């Protein structure tokens, strides 16, 4: 009888924990702000395909034969990064935002593989991500030699990439109140050796996307659109450098 009673307690606790996890996963997600939604539409130079697995921004011309795969930040809707991806496509870069289960890249860290397989015309692949997305993007880059470089937006690698030979760009923002600077500094030894570091003055954590304010973040002195324009410019200069 005691064993049966203990088993019932264990099952009840497991149910409560599981329910709590699902509530956490489904609650508090950041949806795309209205100003990002225009970027989900086709323009003269970019065609947008929004599917269940991701959002693809295809430029009318891709003189670079380069593709950019992007992993969203934790609990942030993929559409919140449409302006950033559209901006890169305007510069001739095929850009794909990978959608994540529960908006958490840890549940689809290998999503870049199917993107690469679907675009054999692309010769050079760059992967990047915001916050948690950047961590998972770095993990993927360490495992797939088809990746040539990594872009970190308010993020850092947990995997040691120092001897990987990968190109890398680290973009941070001066008013970011979410990025753990202590962990970022500790992770500096894991960045590829020739990583380029650039801080966007006046930007904050949420400004790398368009999804409104984020708890704990600093106030931005520039709008998200300006921060993302700066990010696009820095990414293009780094790619072409």
Descriptions of predicted regions:
Residues 84, 179-189:
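Short alpha-helix in the alpha/beta-hydrolase fold that links the catalytic acid
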Residues 85-105:
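Conserved alpha/beta-hydrolase
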Residues 187-241:
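C-terminal catalytic-base region of ester-bond hydrolases, centering on the histidine
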Residues 164, 170-172, 176:
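Short beta-strand/loop motif that positions the catalytic acidic residue
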Residues 1-18, 22:
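N-terminal Sec-pathway targeting helices
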Residues 65-73:
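Short beta-strand element of the alpha/beta-hydrolase
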Residues 128-137:
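Gly/Ala-rich beta-loop-alpha elbow adjacent to hydrolase catalytic centers
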